[in-house]
Swiss-Prot record:
Name of the protein this chain belongs to: Glycerol-3-phosphate acyltransferase
UniProt pathway: Lipid metabolism; phospholipid metabolism
Subunit structure, as described in the record: Probably interacts with PlsX.
Gene assigned in the entry: plsY
Disulphide linkage map: none
Record function comment: Catalyzes the transfer of an acyl group from acyl-phosphate (acyl-PO(4)) to glycerol-3-phosphate (G3P) to form lysophosphatidic acid (LPA). This enzyme utilizes acyl-phosphate as fatty acyl donor, but not acyl-CoA or acyl-ACP.
Principal localisation: membrane
């Protein structure tokens, strides 16, 4: 079982390393999201440089990168504790993809994907939190920061077994948003008003 768990952790990282934003933009004839807009290969930046359909495609694929390995591990009857670490591995792949010189995104959608198998109630709460903050502030980055900050609290009340992996995910995503946090404090962070 240990070998199977390690295999799934590695597989999750490799799946996470497939950058949906870069590949979708490449196939759509769009500029590389790492060099355009906010320079972040994620759905929000794809929304900035293209349209809602393309961004939604990236969002869906990024969510799947988290959901597939965690659900796969669940069906393989891997211990619940390790499911969280498999999810963290998928997010690390998104953030530091081996296939794209370790320059990836911030893993917000992939993290959501890893948490969906815990329960749709949790997924609904996370999506609702993100949408509410975006609607109120028009800042996608702030919505992500608020959502991942409150996620461990949601998990504590719904499935406390997964609190520690969720805390790890939240810490990683907050670290990846450090530049956004600085810009938010300075009032220079860009909004997505024109696209919503």
């Amino acid at each position: 079982m240990l070998l199977l768990t390690l295999t799934m952790i590695i597989a999750a990282y490799l799946i996470g390393s497939i950058s949906s934003a870069i590949l979708v933009c490449r196939f759509s004839g769009l500029p590389d999201p790492r060099t355009t807009g906010s320079k972040n290969p994620g759905a929000t930046n794809v929304l900035r440089i293209s349209n809602k359909f393309t961004a939604a495609t990236v969002l869906f694929l990024d969510i799947l990168k988290g959901t597939i390995p965690v659900w796969g591990a669940y069906f393989l009857k891997i211990d619940s504790l390790y499911l969280g670490f498999i999810g963290v591995s998928a997010c690390l792949g998104h953030m530091y993809p081996i296939f794209f010189n370790f320059k990836g995104g911030k893993a917000v959608a992939t993290a959501l994907g890893t948490l969906l198998p815990i329960g749709f109630t949790l997924g609904g709460l996370l999506i609702l939190t993100w949408v509410l903050v975006v609607k109120l502030t028009k800042y996608s980055s702030l919505a992500a920061i608020v959502t991942v900050s409150i996620a461990p609290l949601y998990v504590y009340f719904l499935k406390p077994l997964y609190v520690y992996p969720t805390l790890m995910l939240s810490a990683l995503i907050l670290f990846r948003h450090r530049d956004n946090i600085k810009r938010l404090l300075k009032g220079t962070e860009s909004k997505i008003t024109h696209k919503i």
